[in-house]
Amino acid sequence: AACSLMKGSNDQQAREIKELIARNFLHPDTNNEFTGNKFFGDSDLTIHRTPHWMASVRMASDRVIGTELVNEDNLKGYYMADGAIYTYIRGDEYHNIFPFWDWRKIPGITAYESEAPVPAFFNYGAHVRNKTAFVGGVTDGETGMTAMVLDRDGLQAHKSWIFTRDYV
């Protein structure tokens, strides 16, 4: 998909795109060059990366559907965008965990304690979306703060995360 960016590019742009791909996509054993904090407003996602660890927070709002169900993959991902936070040091911390995960207790999410099956979301109706627009982040590029108001399934929570060089 990244190679499709080169269509219509001049020689200099094509070289830059190839270098970007080589640096960031072709060698999974090499480090990504990004360090700092970035909030992606169109996706309700925050990424915080230091030389020694990284974290990401996945959220949803009334304008962003928090999770997808495609080809019956992610059948239990209903709560994935209710503030799920992933922290990494090595990069393989979540390898093969999904068959054993309690999908109501994913780090960072807010959900009812229940033995009932995780709700199905075979369509993208209103029940899948967070009912509030209050999801956002501020950053100076190195540190940042992310916040959300969760209002879904009758459950409400005000949630925030502060990202620094040393901690979340």
Over which residues does each language-model region extend?
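Extended polysaccharide-engagement surfaces of secreted carbohydrate-active enzymes
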Residues: 1-168
